[in-house]
UniProtKB/Swiss-Prot annotation:
UniProt organism field: Mus musculus
Residue ranges, compositional bias (Gly residues): 365-377, 540-555, 670-681
Tissue specificity remark: Expressed in brain.
Chain segments carrying region Disordered: 210-280, 292-311, 329-584, 645-685, 755-844, 851-870, 879-920, 946-1061, 1112-1244, 1288-1355, 1367-1567, 1662-1839
Underlying gene: Prr12
Modified residues (N6-acetyllysine): K1214
Name by which UniProt lists this protein: Proline-rich protein 12
Modified residues (Phosphothreonine): T735, T1295, T1555, T1699
GO molecular function: DNA binding
Length: 2035
């Protein structure tokens, strides 16, 4: 590690002067540090390593780096039990001595994680601090270790890759957070702005960045792993990163290149998103770390503001860069430049970091900007990197394509990065964005230099300059000059320029606090600028600054500039360049900010940067991204969103961007909001000052944008917009809006989306609050300010500004100044307890005040806010705490703020400071949910989070929720809880999406993040707890009591917390523990890792979990986003309200929120639900949110929670589909998170608390829901357990899902059950309870499972698995229908679980696949929010995901649909089922272990997202299935495990009257039996389709048996969705017949006297049933044609057993690629099982097929061809597997597979396609030339040279080669009705026969001649001599050895030698052609035999398979054969035409 620290140099340069500067920041960091303290030893070691390094060292050393380390390390890595105290002490001392200590903190943090890298980064005291502060939480996030290490190494030890790899790899990953530093940027930003902000920044940023970058994309998963397992971290990270960062990837590339090893590694390790989650905290730390370096360089001059800023900037940048280039950055920066360079490098990393940066970009951008400012990091990092990284921006560079634009802005920075010139150019370029990105990338490496130069120039100037046109112009020059002074100079240069120029225009505001530093140009600039810069951080930075500077114009400029940067993407680069232009767009933002133009400038700027940025920048960033956002939205949406969102800072940007994207107006608003949110980071700092307004605006926009951003974005947008509108009404509202936006912003981060959504919900509440516009505004503003406050200075300003919006800015500024300190302090408070004293009080007060009071300074404005906030204040406080969760939604802040500051608090919540919270909030807001929250959580329990994965976004949502819970998470669990609750309200909304679950998740998240944030988060909690928390929280965490203490501490929030507490507390507690007790933290981390592990098979879990997180998150996010808008708000609201109701006091804070939220959110929620199909969900969702929150803690389990949460959950479920993830996440995340945290933490500490709470909750639930009796609960618990078990099984399949599945199972069942309740929304409580219960149960179960596994996750998991397996059956023991019903219920639940699990699969798979997030993103963006998410998830994921999609689509709709009606009744039945689940949940909730399970839930979350729909589906089925349990029990475990959750997707279902009656083959295996009439409830049709599309559990279908309907329940087999006959019957007479609609199904098989069918995608052909397929050749051909169709059909959805294939087939048309991806795996797996079932199935099918063989051959053919092609493409994708499945389909005959089938399957290369083609021919078409001719006629020419034909031919040749080796091959194929080779063979034979018949028409063959031609394979043609009597005649002499046409073996009997035949010369060609066609197969066989002989002769002992494979690898030979075949057919066609 130390070597990482080579950073001595790094530290030295940075550390020396800057380090100290940053110390202030460091102090903030300290808070984190305190956490880290836990690892003093480690820390110290590292630190020592550092120590030499220097100031940083000293400061690192003494600072609580240990604390940080402890926090992180301990929490994350180590179990420094002592840590907590040390942490606290450190925190305090660090806070007190903030200056020096922070460094160590960071260092410590770094040390812990990657001490070296961390420390390196941390060396710079300031940055350290920042890092610490941010990093801690953030560090966990993702860049953390890798990035940190990586870039740190690179930078500092630029070339010290070892550290990178090593540290990075191990430490860094753990340190991912630092790596996250890159995420941290935002955090950094925040941090940077103020010390206090630092933390929040960090946190926020981390969240943002981590979450955003990583978080959003892969944060959850990515982070978590890193978090948990450092190493795993990397894996996920990549995935995440890539997603998250494309930038990362890109960055990685760039960065990697840059820092190269480090960077790369970074990518791997740090970049990997996982780190973000886990590393978020680290990230923060990293940020700090990074920052520190930056700080060192530039900070020295303006340490305070700058420090932060620089820190931010550096840090941000650094993180960004730091991520990858952190080292580089830092190292580079050794001096500023280095950092700049490094940063750039880092920027590259930034890419990775970008996310960080991106977020950071908010921060980083801000940070980067700041970094840029701060060092040139910013640019590097950020923007480009960031952006790039960010996705939002990073993407620009890299993966974010879209993001790039935003990134562009970042990029510009990056570009700047590229060079100062570039910087400006970049800045300018913003368009350059791309360039920037590039620049960045290039810059990155080059950036090292350039970056620094640019960094400098760019950073400061760049961002500013660039960002701002003004400074820009000046900037460029400046930058150049700056570059010279790289770090400082640049920083200063432009800093000043910026500062002054625009930077400072805005900066001035920041001035107040940061101004000075700001002034300290570099610092100020960075700081402010940075803030702004943040904004600028890319654009915002520039823009922000520009804007800032631009002030009015500038302001706008900043905004727009940001926008330009960002905007450019969004607005257009031009704006980027052209601030003004941007401004236009941005302006609104800015404008919005305008009021706070100046402040906004600053704020805006900061905000812009953060808020601004968020707003302007953010907006821009975001907006850029906004614009970009829009673009980004889709692409970025996830990436960017993730990145962006992750980069909430950018987030802000994202939000902003989102916002921007959202719309300038929105942007304006959003921007403002975003800015606020986004700005949060900036805002907190500068933004805070004024951005709040702007921020709010941005926030709003953010929300909108967010919404926009995500697929959900739109929803969210709507939501956000709604919010906006609601909020919009008043800017104040705006603030809320901002919050909302912010919230939305989260949404924007797909990942964050969840959070986002969740956040969103908060916004809605804020909207509601908007009603309290003024207050809101104030609140929001306050929130913003709070957020900003996070950056104390700005916050105050912001707050005032926010508060006053326009009016207060001034005060704000001053306040800011004050605040800076205070907030800083506050930040510090959280971060640096010492300052906290004031801050503490402040915090307390602020927190109390709702954060509105943020700091005393802010108080005044807070006061206004306070006024609003007061209630809110409490809330705020709580909110701050809770807001943490809320924070997740900056919106939380905003909304919370709106709510009452809750949001601020919430945001703040992330904040470790009440005020800070707000500040943080913004950060959080910006990055909070994802980054922060998630990061935090991630930091804390990245694993958990990851597990929650769903979590990332969900986490975010959860984070938001968690924030509610997060409050708990916050460490001030209780307070936060409560606050969170309120914020939760808003957050709830946020939570709503992830809501219930999320809450825990959030909590967890928070907890995780709270590590740092915990400090921060806890802070909010603590804040309420306030300073104490700050101090105390850390202490509390150490002891279990502390969490409780927290609760008490939360005193005021306590109630809320109380209710939330159990879960929350766990979270909080856990969080606190983690945070406070570093060791616990570490332990938790470890635990978490373990938990995670156990949850997801440790490593696998890690990665998968990570992935899962991501997928989950994505889906969740998507869901969140999609659902979020409604759900979040609604959920939040509902959640809140219900929760409050149920939770009552506990939810108290929330309650208010709830009230507010209830109203508006619900509507919103409803819509969301509506889309998601969760009308009830809306209510329930809300409920769920609340419930989630509460249940989240234990909540899900809570019956009451169940109700509330259930509702929410339900809602989420329904909407969740995608959103499911969120709720799941919320549930899973929340509960799991909480649990995990608690599990981890909770193990020690929370366990009791949680348990008590849970028990209490259970009691409550039971009281509330008598239905949920213990027995039932127990039953359900068992069931859930079993369900979980399923997941475990599943997990086996998907490691990650394992745990998550566990949770998923719980969730799913819960969910499945839940949905009905949601349906019952009408019956809110019961229904919600049910749903919640279900969800809760699920979660609970998961929780329990996890919880149980908490201590030893793995063991637990295993036990759970076993238990589940054992219990599964008993699950319904309670139910009346014990067998049937139980089974049904189990089945439903299993299905739900399966669906959930599947998603986790998806998640894990996704996790495994970096693309997953992107995929998700795409899907998310794309159409069905749920579906896409799911599909995307699935798609990206694996077959399972697709499965999920397939199953879910139908399910969700039906579930919801049926549910509405059935649910009410079902609730009772479900009572057994649902209630049971609920009780289960409750028990689960009640049991502390559940908290651990929650971690699984997070994984589940991803799963859950899909599952929810399935759940709904399940629910309907549950309702019905409840009764019929057959299928479930049967495959619930295994089948469900894998496919349970998601089956292969199917585009649609053939419902009579609804589907086109085209004679299109329905595809898929199975036989259509006209005699079997199946129907489905009319109301279930939408659910069915949705479920099939998503792979979720569909509603049941019924077979008409005269006057009875036999129920067929859905299940998954081999990934395919099928329906199994049950013994449940309903009457079908009278009016019942009107309620059902005919459905077309294909009969698959009959096993154990049970029929299995699958729903057709299209109406099957109705061919006259041919009695039997004739084997007659003639007939055969027809059958061939006909059969072909069936095979085609089969093919389309290959064999059911091969669900994947089937899915593929079915889906291929639409999602062929997707299926292809997933399919292969599934088929492989299913393939073995398939045979048996399939054999029977095949037999049946065979008969059926025979019946239908007569179908129109032609259409069939055509279809077949078409499908074949699709299949083929799939096949290609799936390769053998695919083929296999395809062949299987050919199995349409339903014959048992041949014994060799497996081998063949493996060998089958083109079988699938071949099967496709020939699938139909029943008999050897060879012999018969008749029937198929028609069909074949159509096919030949068309298929001749198609890929399908080639594949078919390949399969044909493979079969012939096999036959050459094994003479009995063909016979065996025939006997077994092989579907792999027979279809292709028959198709080819059919073609030949068809052509032969055509040729025959031209000939008049005598029987003798024909017989001779047929008998002899050779034909000699002799022309008669001229002059001979027969001139003109030709002699045909048949020759050769007769052979058996069927087996191709020589006949043993002797044949009379053929005679000569004379034919006309003209006709001789026809004879030879006829002969060639007839014997083509044999001739080819002979060639194959020659080939095999040649191969066998050349090699020794080659097995048949090897020989076959070698032949098939001989491409030229195959081509030659195919060409000869094509020529032959072409010749035949030509001859047949002429004639």
């Amino acid at each position: 590690m130390d070597r990482n620290y080579p950073s001595a140099g790094f530290g030295d340069p940075l550390g020396a002067g800057a380090g100290w500067s940053y110390e202030r920041s460091a102090k903030a960091s300290l808070v984190y540090g305190s956490s880290r303290t836990s690892h003093p030893e480690t820390d110290i070691l590292h630190r020592q390593a550092y120590a030499a390094p220097h100031p940083l060292q000293s400061y690192a050393t003494n600072h609580h780096p240990a604390g940080l380390s402890g926090l992180f390390d301990t929490g994350l890595h180590h179990a420094g039990s002592a840590g907590p105290d040390a942490s606290v002490m450190n925190l305090i001392s660090a806070l007190e001595s903030r200056g020096p200590q922070p460094g160590p903190s960071a260092s410590s943090l770094l040390s812990q994680f990657r001490s070296p890298s961390w420390q390196t980064a941390m060396h710079t005291p300031g940055p350290t601090e920042l890092f610490i502060s941010g990093a801690l939480p953030g560090s966990s996030t993702f860049p953390s270790s890798s990035a940190l290490s990586a870039y740190q190494h690179p930078a500092s030890f630029g070339s010290r890759p070892f550290p990178v790899p090593s540290s990075l790899s191990l430490q860094d990953p753990p340190f991912s957070p630092p790596a996250n530093g890159l995420l941290s940027p935002h955090d950094v930003l925040h941090l940077k702005p103020s010390q206090a902000p630092t933390v929040p920044s960090s946190l926020g940023f981390e969240r943002l960045a981590g979450g955003g970058v990583l978080g959003p994309a892969g944060l959850g998963p990515a982070q978590t792993p890193p978090y948990r397992p450092g190493p795993p971290d990397p894996p996920p990270p990549p995935r995440h990163l890539p997603t998250q960062f494309n930038l990362l990837a890109s960055s990685s590339a760039a960065t990697a290149a840059e820092p190269s090893s480090p960077q790369l590694y970074n990518f791997s390790g740090a970049a990997p998103g996982p780190p973000p989650e886990r590393a978020l905290p680290r990230q923060d730390t990293v940020i700090k770390h990074y920052q520190r370096p930056a700080s060192a360089q530039p900070p020295p001059p303006p340490p305070p503001a700058h420090s932060l800023q620089h820190y931010l900037s550096c840090g941000g940048s650094y993180p960004s860069m730091g991520h990858r280039a952190s080292l580089a950055c830092s190292p580079l920066g050794g001096g500023e430049p280095s950092p700049g360079a490094g940063e750039p490098s880092k920027g590259g990393p930034s890419g990775a970091t970008a996310g960080a940066a991106g977020r950071a970009t908010g921060p980083e951008t801000a940070g980067g900007g700041a970094a840029g400012g701060g060092g040139g990091y910013r640019p590097i990092i950020q923007s480009p990197g960031y952006k790039t990284s960010k996705g939002g921006y990073g993407p620009a560079t890299g993966g974010a394509t879209r993001p790039p634009p935003p990134r562009s802005t970042a990029t510009p920075k990056c570009q700047s990065l590229g060079g100062p010139a570039a910087a400006y150019a970049a800045g300018k370029a913003s368009g350059a964005g791309g360039a920037g990105s590039q620049a960045y990338s290039p810059g990155q490496p080059q950036g090292l230099l350039g970056p620094q130069a640019y960094g400098q120039g760019f950073g400061g100037g760049q961002a500013q300059d660039l960002s701002k046109g003004p400074s820009y112009s000046g900037g460029p020059p400046q930058p150049p000059s700056g570059p010279p002074p790289p770090g400082l100079a640049t920083c200063q240069s432009y800093s000043p320029d910026q500062l002054q120029g625009q930077l400072y225009g805005v900066q001035s505001e920041p001035y107040p606090g940061p101004a000075a530093h700001s002034q300290g140009l570099p610092t100020a600039s960075p700081s402010l600028s940075y803030s702004t810069g943040h904004s600028p951080a890319l654009s915002g930075h520039g823009g922000g600054w520009g804007p800032s500077s631009l002030g009015g114009g500038g302001e706008a400029s900043p905004s727009h500039i940001i926008r330009p940067l960002q905007s450019p993407p969004a607005t257009g680069r031009p704006p980027g360049v052209g601030s003004p232009g941007a401004p236009g767009k941005y302006l609104s933002s800015v404008l919005a900010s305008a009021p706070f133009l100046a402040p906004p400038g600053a704020s805006s700027y900061a905000a812009g940067a953060g808020g601004y940025k968020g707003k302007g920048d953010g907006s821009e960033l975001l907006a850029g991204p906004g614009g970009s956002a829009a673009e980004r939205t889709e692409d970025e949406e996830f990436l960017i969103q993730h990145l962006l969102q992750a980069p909430s800072p950018p987030r802000t940007s994202g939000a902003d961007g989102l916002v921007g994207e959202d719309g300038p107006a929105d942007a304006a608003k959003g921007l403002g909001g975003s800015g606020g949110a986004g700005g949060a980071p900036g805002t907190p700092y500068e933004l805070a000052k004024e951005d709040p307004q702007r921020y709010h605006l941005q926030s709003v926009i953010r929300t909108s944008a967010s919404l926009d951003e995500g697929a959900t974005a739109a929803l969210e947008l709507g939501l956000g917009r709604m919010k906006d509108k609601k909020k919009g009404p008043e800017r104040g509202g705006e603030t809320p809006e901002g919050l909302a936006t912010s919230v939305v912003h989260y949404g924007a981060g797909a990942k964050e989306l969840g959070a986002f959504l969740q956040k969103s919900p908060p916004p809605p509440p804020p909207s509601a609050q908007a009603t309290q516009p003024a207050p809101h505004g104030l609140l929001l503003e306050a929130g913003g300010p709070d957020l900003p406050m996070v950056l104390p200075p700005p916050p105050p300003q912001l707050l005032p500004s926010v508060l006053s919006h326009a009016p207060s800015p001034s005060p704000s500024a001053p306040k800011v100044g004050v605040h800076l300190l205070e907030p800083a302090t506050r930040d510090g408070a959280p971060q640096p307890p010492p300052p906290p004293p004031p801050p503490m009080p402040l915090q307390l007060e602020a927190h109390l005040r709702g954060h509105g009071l943020e700091p005393t300074a802010p108080s005044p404005r807070l006061r206004p806010e306070e006024s609003l906030e007061p209630p809110g204040a409490m809330q705020e406080l709580l909110g701050a705490l809770e807001p943490l969760p809320s924070g997740p939604g900056d919106p939380g802040v905003g909304p919370p703020n709106s709510e009452g500051k809750d949001p601020a608090g919430a945001y703040r919540s992330p904040s470790p400071q009440g005020t800070k919270a707000p500040r943080f909030v913004p950060l959080t807001s910006i990055c909070f949910p994802d980054s922060l929250l998630q990061d935090e959580e991630r930091s804390f329990f990245p694993t958990m989070e990851e597990m929650f994965g769903g979590g990332a976004a969900d986490d975010y949502g959860k984070a938001g929720q968690t924030e509610d819970d997060g409050d708990p998470k916050t460490g001030a669990g209780p307070p936060p809880g409560p606050t969170a609750y309120d914020p939760y309200g808003p957050y709830c909304g946020g939570r709503a999406s992830g809501t219930g679950p999320e809450t825990p998740g959030l909590g967890l998240d928070h907890n995780k993040p709270p590590e740092l944030p915990s400090t921060v988060n806890a802070e909010p909690l603590g804040l309420i707890q306030s300073g104490p928390h700050q101090s105390a929280p850390p202490p509390p965490p150490p002891p279990p009591p502390p969490p409780p203490v927290s609760e008490p501490k939360g005193g005021l929030t306590s109630p809320i917390f109380c209710s939330t507490k159990p879960k929350k507390l766990l979270k909080t507690s856990s969080f606190h523990l983690l945070r406070r007790r570093d060791p616990p933290f570490q332990t938790p981390k470890k635990l978490y890792a373990q938990e995670y592990e156990f949850e997801a098979d440790e490593d696998k879990a890690d990665v998968p979990a990570d992935i899962r997180l991501n997928p989950r998150r994505l889906p969740d996010l998507v869901s969140s986003c999609r659902s979020r808008p409604a759900l979040s708000p609604l959920g939040d609201i509902d959640f809140c309200p219900p929760n409050p109701g149920p939770d009552g006091p506990r939810r108290r804070g929330r309650k208010p929120t709830k009230a507010k939220r209830d109203g508006p959110p619900r509507p919103r929620g409803r819509p969301r639900i509506r889309p998601l199909e969760g009308p009830a969900m809306a209510g329930p969702a809300s409920i769920t949110t609340d419930g989630a929150k509460k249940p989240r803690g234990r909540g899900r389990g809570r019956g009451r929670k169940a109700e509330e949460m259930g509702g929410t959950r339900l809602e989420p479920l329904k909407p969740l589909k995608i959103k499911l993830s969120v709720p799941k996440a919320g549930e899973g995340l929340g509960a799991p998170s909480n649990d995990v945290i608690s599990g981890v933490d909770h193990n020690s500490l929370d366990s009791n608390l949680t348990r008590e709470k849970i028990e209490a909750k259970i009691k409550e639930v039971e009281e509330k829901q008598p239905e949920m009796k213990s027995g039932f609960m127990a039953s359900f618990l068992d069931f859930l357990k079993s369900g979980k078990r399923h997941p475990p099984l599943y997990q086996a399949g998907l490691t990650p899902p394992l745990s998550p599945p566990k949770s998923v199972p719980a969730s799913v069942p819960t969910r499945g059950l839940q949905p009905p309740p949601p349906t019952v929304p009408t019956v809110p409580h019961p229904a919600p309870s049910g749903p919640f219960g279900l969800g809760g149960a699920l979660e609970a179960a998961e929780s329990e499972g996890l919880g149980l596994g908490c201590p030893s996750p793995c063991k637990r998991l295993d036990e759970e698995l076993k238990r589940n397996l054992e219990t599964l059956p008993s699950f319904s023991s309670d139910e009346e229908d014990s067998v049937a019903k139980n089974r049904d219920l189990q089945e439903s639940i299993s299905s739900a679980i399966s669906a959930l699990d599947d998603p986790p699969l998806t998640g894990p798979k996704d996790t495994s696949t970096p693309e997953e997030p992107p995929l998700d993103t795409g899907p998310t963006a794309s159409g069905p929010p749920p579906l896409p998410s799911l599909p995307s998830s699935n798609s990206s994921g694996t077959p399972e995901p697709p499965l999920l999609e397939e199953k879910p689509p139908p399910t969700p709709p039906p579930a919801p649909t049926p549910q509405p009606a059935p649910p009410p009744p079902p609730p009772p039945p479900p009572v057994p089922a649902l209630p049971s689940p609920t009780p289960l949940v409750t028990p689960v909730a009640s049991s502390p272990p559940p908290p651990p399970p929650p971690p699984p839930p997070p994984p589940a979350l991803p799963s859950p997202p899909p599952p929810p729909p399935p759940a709904p589906t399940t629910v309907p089925p549950v309702a019905p299935p409840e009764e019929p349990p057959a299928p479930s029990p049967e495959d619930p475990e295994p089948p469900d495990a894998r496919p349970l959750h998601l089956a292969k997707k199917q585009e649609t279902a053939a419902v009579c009257g609804e589907t086109d009656e085209e004679a299109g083959e329905s595809g898929g295996e199975g036989i259509f039996r006209e005699r079997d009439e199946f129907v489905i409830r009319a109301e279930d049709i939408p659910s069915l389709k949705l479920a099939l599309q998503t792979g979720r559990e569909p509603p049941p279908i019924w077979r008409v048996q005269k006057a009875l309907l036999q129920k067929f329940t859905p299940e998954i087999k081999d990934g395919q969705r099928q329906f199994c006959a049950t013994s449940n019957y309903l009457g079908y007479f009278g009016d019942a017949k009107n309620r059902y609609q005919r459905l077309y199904v294909k009969f698959l098989e009959n096993v154990n006297k049970k029929d299995y069918v699958r729903v057709c995608a299209r109406k099957p052909w109705h061919r006259p049933p041919l009695p039997v397929r004739r084997s007659g050749q003639t007939k055969g051909p027809t059958p061939v044609g006909g059969n072909s169709a069936p095979p085609s059909k089969v093919q389309a959805p290959p064999p059911k057993p091969e669900t994947p294939e089937k899915m593929t087939s079915e889906k291929p048309p639409e999602p062929a690629p997707e299926p292809a991806v997933p399919e292969p795996p599934a088929p492989e797996k299913p393939s073995p099982p398939r045979p048996v079932e399939k054999e029977k199935e095949k037999e049946k099918e065979k008969e059926k097929e025979k019946e239908r063989v007569t179908r129109p051959l032609r259409s069939e053919r055509a279809t077949s061809g078409r499908q074949m092609r699709t299949d083929r493409s799939l096949a290609t994708g799936q390769s053998t597997t695919s083929r296999l499945p395809k062949a299987r389909p050919s199995k349409v005959k339903a014959e048992p597979p041949p014994k060799k089938r497996k081998k063949w399957l493996k060998e089958a290369v083109g079988n699938a396609s071949a099967g496709d083609g020939p699938g139909g021919s029943s008999s050897d078409s060879e012999s018969s030339p008749g029937a198929p001719s028609e069909d074949e006629r159509a096919v030949p020419g068309r298929l001749l040279k198609t890929r399908a034909m080639r594949e078919m031919y390949r399969s044909y040749v493979e079969m012939l080669v096999s036959t050459a080796l094994d003479p009995d091959m063909i016979q065996a194929l025939e006997d077994t009705h092989d579907e792999l080779y027979l279809p292709p063979m028959r198709k080819i034979d059919g073609l030949l026969n068809e052509h032969k018949k055509k040729v025959l028409k031209r000939l008049s063959l005598s029987p003798a001649l024909q017989d001779a031609l047929h008998t002899f394979p050779q034909l000699q043609v002799e022309q008669t001599g001229e002059g001979s009597p027969e001139e003109g005649a030709v002699r045909l002499r048949p020759a050769g050895e007769p052979y058996n046409r069927k087996t191709l073996s020589k006949l043993k009997r002797s044949v009379v030698r053929a005679q000569e035949f004379k034919v006309e010369l003209e006709k001789s060609g026809y004879y030879t052609l006829y002969h060639s066609l007839h014997h083509y197969k044999y001739h080819t066989f002979l060639r194959c035999r020659d080939q095999t002989l040649a191969i066998e002769g050349g090699a020794e002992d080659l097995g048949q398979e090897e020989v076959v494979q070698q032949c098939m690898r001989n491409q030229p030979w195959l081509e030659q054969l195919f060409d000869s075949f094509s020529d032959l057919l072409a010749q035949a066609q030509a001859h047949s035409r002429c004639g």
